[in-house]
Amino acid sequence: MTVLIHVLGSDIPHHNRTVLRFFNDALAATSEHAREFMVVGKDDGLSDSCPALSVQFFPGKKSLAEAVIAKAKANRQQRFFFHGQFNPTLWLALLSGGIKPSQFFWHIWGADLYELSSGLRYKLFYPLRRLAQKRVGCVFATRGDLSFFAKTHPKVRGELLYFPTRMDPSLNTMANDRQREGKMTILVGNSGDLSNEHVAALRAVHQQFGDTVKVVVPMGYPPNNEAYIEEVRQAGLELFSEENLQILSEKLEFDAYLALLRQCDLGYFIFARQQGIGTLCLLIQAGIPCVLNRENPFWQDMTEQHLPVLFTTDDLNEDIVREAQRQLASVDKNTIAFFSPNYLQGWQRALAIAAGEGA
């Protein structure tokens, strides 16, 4: 029997590390289809920290894609589980027949589903990628992304699956005994990536609340982002007093990030696509409601789990935020489908489907 190969086709260190550690800790011991990986990026100790996995590293997207295509052509029974993707050569290989639909299983992370870039090369590539996506054997995604994908690709099989956010289930009740009062603290964005549209988000928060709230903007990831961080800082200082604006330019360790989130009263995410599910999960776990763009389909997943959702188009004030906090406090967080360990069942099913052993 041919063992399933997992492909992390783009160098996204934080996400790739999360996936590898999740497979090593939660899946590899019980499934032979959870052990083989091809990854773009440097080892940086990952092999040592994930001893249950066999990981082959590649210096770039093209070299990985060439290796995947060669394996696919050499053995048409070989199946691949593409996580996130973000690799144009692989899409073109699927479109041209280098990789067959029966070999291609894709976990949607968001960016490769939406067509938000305005550059000419992207405009030329998007129609080809759309054609290739019609040939995917099966897609795995959030409820909202499945709905979005089905509008243009109704014949492609879709299965519910959530990114394996690092979470401690014992913290599900950590917010229940906390009293929230006084000046509100609002988290803006989930990272320093431009897709967070930080300046527009800061303006939106100011329009709703003025300079009456403290705004925290985590921008420690990705690295080498100093020019953009300074641009956001200057824009923020035009809107908020210095004491009400906190720009975090250093990457925080997980426990420090958790502690930061617990000090917030609201998360504000203006982006119009599904992203940042990890931060959303950690905020919800801490009893902190989130404001989403109505175009972000993840609101469908939240309402399915009976979670309060606020939108950027709503008229927001402190009373509305406090009411959302009260509603969130009444939810049994141990039942939320996209929380750990509940998402594990979806991963076990996804492995079986991608390996050709499931219904």
From Swiss-Prot:
GO MF term set: 4-acetamido-4,6-dideoxy-D-galactose transferase activity; fucosyltransferase activity
Protein name (record): TDP-N-acetylfucosamine:lipid II N-acetylfucosaminyltransferase
Protein family membership: Belongs to the glycosyltransferase 56 family.
Source organism of the structure: Escherichia coli O8 (strain IAI1)
Keyword Nucleotide-binding: no
Localization per record: Cell inner membrane
Annotated coiled-coil segments of the chain: none
Disulfide-bond pairs as recorded: none
Keyword terms: Cell inner membrane, Cell membrane, Glycosyltransferase, Membrane, Transferase
Keyword Iron: no
GO biological process: enterobacterial common antigen biosynthetic process; fucosylation
InterPro entries (UniProt xref): WecF
Pathway named in the protein's UniProt entry: Bacterial outer membrane biogenesis; enterobacterial common antigen biosynthesis
Pfam family membership, one: Glyco_transf_56
